[in-house]
Curated annotation (Swiss-Prot):
<feature type="binding site">
    <location>
        <begin position="116"/>
        <end position="123"/>
    </location>
    <ligand>
        <name>ATP</name>
    </ligand>
</feature>
<dbReference type="GO" id="GO:0007131">
    <property type="term" value="P:reciprocal meiotic recombination"/>
</dbReference>
<feature type="region of interest" description="Interaction with RAD51B, RAD51D and XRCC3">
    <location>
        <begin position="70"/>
        <end position="127"/>
    </location>
</feature>
<feature type="compositionally biased region" description="Polar residues">
    <location>
        <begin position="344"/>
        <end position="354"/>
    </location>
</feature>
<dbReference type="GO" id="GO:0005737">
    <property type="term" value="C:cytoplasm"/>
</dbReference>
<dbReference type="GO" id="GO:0000722">
    <property type="term" value="P:telomere maintenance via recombination"/>
</dbReference>
<keyword id="KW-0597">Phosphoprotein</keyword>
<comment type="subunit">
    <text>Part of the RAD51 paralog protein complexes BCDX2 and CX3; the complexes have a ring-like structure arranged into a flat disc around a central channel. The BCDX2 complex consits of RAD51B, RAD51C, RAD51D and XRCC2; the CX3 complex consists of RAD51C and XRCC3. The BCDX2 subcomplex RAD51B:RAD51C interacts with RAD51. Interacts with SWSAP1; involved in homologous recombination repair. Interacts directly with PALB2 which may serve as a scaffold for a HR complex containing PALB2, BRCA2, RAD51C, RAD51 and XRCC3. Interacts with HELQ.</text>
</comment>
<dbReference type="InterPro" id="IPR013632">
    <property type="entry name" value="DNA_recomb/repair_Rad51_C"/>
</dbReference>
<feature type="region of interest" description="Disordered">
    <location>
        <begin position="343"/>
        <end position="366"/>
    </location>
</feature>
<dbReference type="GO" id="GO:0008821">
    <property type="term" value="F:crossover junction DNA endonuclease activity"/>
</dbReference>
<keyword id="KW-0238">DNA-binding</keyword>
<comment type="similarity">
    <text>Belongs to the RecA family. RAD51 subfamily.</text>
</comment>
<dbReference type="InterPro" id="IPR052093">
    <property type="entry name" value="HR_Repair_Mediator"/>
</dbReference>
<keyword id="KW-0496">Mitochondrion</keyword>
<dbReference type="GO" id="GO:0005634">
    <property type="term" value="C:nucleus"/>
</dbReference>
<keyword id="KW-0547">Nucleotide-binding</keyword>
Length: 366
C-alpha cells in the first residue's frame, strides 16, 4: 500500500510544493532524479537531495527486518543475531596487526571510518581493500567486488596495479603449498584484468554529486550483487569546501550516514569512509581531531585514526562495539599495506599512545 506524503517528516514548505506539483505518494517522488525534482517542484538541488534521502530512508526503516535481510516483518532471536555476527565475514588488510585489533579485518555489515592527516595511508588502505575484497573464499577472502567513490582525486590506478600484482603473487605462493585443485582453479580467474574490472570507480567533484551518487547506490548494488565493499574516500572534502550552511550540512551528513548504514545491513557489505583531521585549540594547545564535528563521530560503527609518531605510522582503534581500544604500527611498502617492523622504540611509543588516548577530547565542529 502506497503512503501519502503527509505521513513523512518533510518540511511543510517542501511538502506543499510537492503536492502542488502533483506528487501524492513517496513512490511518485522516488521515481524522479534530484535535478528533475528540483526544476519540477521549484526547490534547490540541496532540498531535492535531502527530500529524496528522507523518503528513501523512511521507506527502508518502515519495513522491520533482521540485520542483512529484506523480508518485511521477519523476527530474529538474539541467538540468530549472534550467529550472523560470527558468520558475517571480514576483508583482510594484509596487515595482521590491524586485522587482529579489528577482530579479523574490516567487518562486513558495518561502517568503518578511517581518519588521518594527508599522506598517512588512508587512501592506500582503501585501494588495498578494493583489491583484497576480491580474494577467493578458499584463500580466506570474501570473493566480492568494490565500489570506490573518490571526492579528492586521490585514486591512482597505477598504484592499484602494483597492489593487485603483489596480491596475486602472494596467493600463488600460498597455492604452491596446497595440493587442492580448488586453489589452482580460483587463481585462474584472479587475474590483474579481472581485479581492475571489478573495482567500480566514481569521481564526485562536489557534495551534490556525492549525495546523488549515494542516492543511486541501492539500484547499482541491485544490479551488481557481488559488491561487498563501498568506499567513500574523502567524506569531509566536499562538505567543508562547498557548503557554508552548517545546519543544512549536518542534515545532509546525517542522511548520508543513515543511507550507508542501510546499505551495509541490507546488502551485507562493508562501508569505508575516510575523513580528514582538523586543528582544535584547547587550553592553549593545538590538537588534531577528526573533521565534521562531534555529531559525525557517532555516524560510523568503527573509527580508526591513523597518525604519525616520529617517522612511524600508527593506527589506533578509537571506537568499536566489540573490540578494545588498541594502537598498532603499520607501514606502506611497494607491495601495499603491511605490518611494521617492531622495534623497542616503537613498542614504547605504542604504550604511551594507548595511555594518552584514554583522555579523550570532543571533536570540534568544523
Amino acid at each position: 500500500m502506497q503512503r501519502e506524503l503527509v505521513g513523512y517528516p518533510l518540511s511543510p514548505a517542501v511538502r506543499g510544493k510537492l503536492v502542488a506539483a502533483g506528487f501524492q505518494t513517496a513512490e511518485d517522488v522516488l521515481e524522479v532524479k534530484p535535478s528533475e525534482l528540483s526544476k519540477e517542484v521549484g526547490i534547490s538541488k540541496e532540498e531535492a537531495l535531502e527530500t529524496l534521502q528522507i523518503l528513501r530512508r523512511e521507506c527502508l526503516t518502515n519495513k522491520p527486518r533482521c540485520a542483512g535481510t529484506s523480508v518485511a516483518n521477519e523476527k530474529c532471536t538474539a541467538l540468530e543475531l549472534l550467529e550472523q555476527e560470527h558468520t558475517q565475514g571480514f576483508i583482510i588488510t594484509f596487515c595482521s596487526a590491524l586485522d587482529n585489533i579489528l577482530g579479523g579485518g574490516i567487518p562486513l555489515m558495518k561502517t568503518t571510518e578511517v581518519c588521518g592527516v594527508p599522506g598517512v595511508g588512508k587512501t592506500q588502505l582503501c585501494m588495498q581493500l578494493a583489491v583484497d575484497v576480491q580474494i577467493p573464499e578458499c584463500f580466506g577472502g570474501v570473493a566480492g567486488e568494490a565500489v570506490f567513490i573518490d571526492t579528492e582525486g586521490s585514486f591512482m590506478v597505477d598504484r592499484v596495479v602494483s597492489l593487485a600484482t603483489a596480491c596475486i603473487q602472494h596467493l600463488h605462493l600460498i597455492a604452491g603449498t596446497h595440493t587442492e585443485e580448488e586453489h589452482q582453479k580460483a587463481l585462474k580467474d584472479f587475474t590483474l584484468e579481472n581485479i581492475l574490472s571489478h573495482i567500480y570507480y566514481f569521481r564526485c567533484h562536489d557534495y551534490t554529486e556525492l549525495l546523488a551518487q549515494v542516492y543511486l547506490l541501492p539500484d547499482f548494488l541491485s544490479d551488481h550483487p557481488k559488491v561487498q565493499l563501498v568506499i567513500i574516500d574523502g567524506i569531509a572534502f566536499p562538505f567543508r569546501h562547498d557548503l557554508e550552511d552548517l545546519s543544512l550540512r549536518t542534515r545532509l551528513l546525517n542522511g548520508l550516514a543513515q543511507q550507508m548504514i542501510s546499505l551495509a545491513n541490507n546488502h551485507r557489505l562493508a562501508v569505508i569512509l575516510t575523513n580528514q583531521m582538523t586543528t582544535k585549540i584547547d587550553k592553549n594547545q593545538a590538537l588534531l581531531v577528526p573533521a565534521l564535528g562531534e555529531s559525525w563521530g557517532h555516524a560510523a560503527t568503527i573509527r580508526l585514526i591513523f597518525h604519525w609518531e616520529q617517522k612511524q605510522r600508527f593506527a589506533t582503534l578509537y571506537k568499536s562495539p566489540s573490540q578494545k581500544e588498541s594502537t598498532i604500527p603499520f607501514q606502506i611498502t611497494p607491495q601495499g599495506f603491511r605490518d611494521a617492523v617492531v622495534t623497542a622504540a616503537s613498542s614504547q611509543t605504542e604504550s604511551s599512545l594507548n595511555f594518552r588516548k584514554r583522555s579523550r577530547e570532543p571533536e570540534e565542529e568544523c
